[in-house]
Curated annotation (Swiss-Prot):
Record-given protein name: Putative S-adenosyl-L-methionine-dependent methyltransferase MAP_3564
Sites where the protein binds S-adenosyl-L-methionine: D135, D164, L165
Keyword Methyltransferase applies: yes
Enzyme class: transferase
BP terms from Gene Ontology: methylation
Amino acid sequence: MSSLRTHDDTWDIKSSVGTTAVMVAAARAVETEQPDPLIRDPYAKLLVTNSGAGVLWEAMLDPDIAARVEALDEESAAHLHHMRGYQAVRTHFFDTYFADAVAAGIRQIVILASGLDSRAYRLDWPAGTTVYEIDQPQVLAYKSTTLAENGVTPSADRREVAVDLRQDWPAALRAAGFDPTQRTAWLAEGLLMYLPAEAQDRLFTLIGELSPAGSRVAAETAPNHADERRQQMRERFKKVADEIGFEQTVDVGELMYRDDHRADVTEWLNAHGWRATAEHSTAAMRRLGRWIENVPLADDKDAFSDFVVAERR
C-alpha cells in the first residue's frame, strides 16, 4: 500500500503525484542538453522552471549537481545518474513505439496520466493524428497554458480529457471525440506504480474494451523494491539533500503502491486478447549505452521496470 494516498486524492503540478511529472521533465531536459541525446524535448526545461514545484526538481537541471552529490555519497550519485539515464531510455523507447504505431497507420493516440508529456507538441505526427491526453484537470491546464503562453503549439490534434483515471474516464474520452471503432495506440508510462493492483487490472480491461484488433498498448511496469532497501535509500537521500540544502517536499516512494499480488503486465495482456512482449529496462539501458554499473540494486531484477508493448488480436 501507499502511506500518502487515498482512494479519492487529487493533485496539481506542485503536489503529490503531480510533482513526479516535474521530476521526469527535469530528466528529459537534462538529456536534451547532452552532446548526443537519446531524445530531444525542447519544452521540458520550460515546464520545470515555471512549475513552482520546489528547488529540488529545478536543481536537477544543474549540470554540476551530480558531482556535488558524488562528493557526499557515491551510491546516491550513482542512483541520480541512473534515474536520468533511465528516463532518457524510457522516453526513447516509447517515442519509438509511437513512431512504429503511426507507421502502421494508427492515427488515434491516448496518453494515460500524461503529466508533462510533450509528445503532442514535439513529435512529428502524420496529418490526421489525434492525441488524447488524460490527467487531472490542474495538471493539463498548467501544461497547455504554459506552452501556449510561450508560443508553443501542438503538432497534432491535441485533446485534453480532464478526468481522474479512477472515475469514468472512458465516457470522458468518448465525449472528447474518441472513436472506439478505430485502431488506437495507448500509453501507460509512469502510471502503474501509482495504481493499486486491482486498479491496474481494471485499467487494462477498459483499454481492451475500447480497442479493436490491431490496436496497440505500451506500458512501463511497476518495480518492486524491498522495504528495507527502500528505507536505506530514503535515509541516504535525505542526508544528501540536507547537506546540499534541498527541501524535500514529497517522498516519491511513499506515493507508490507496493502490491505483491500485482499482475505481471505481459502475462495479463497475453491472457486477455493481446500479443505482448517486454524488454527489461536494464537491457534497454545497456542497449542504448545508459546503464550505470554501480547503481544500487543492480542485481535485483524486480527492482527495475519492464517496457511492455502489445497488439490487440
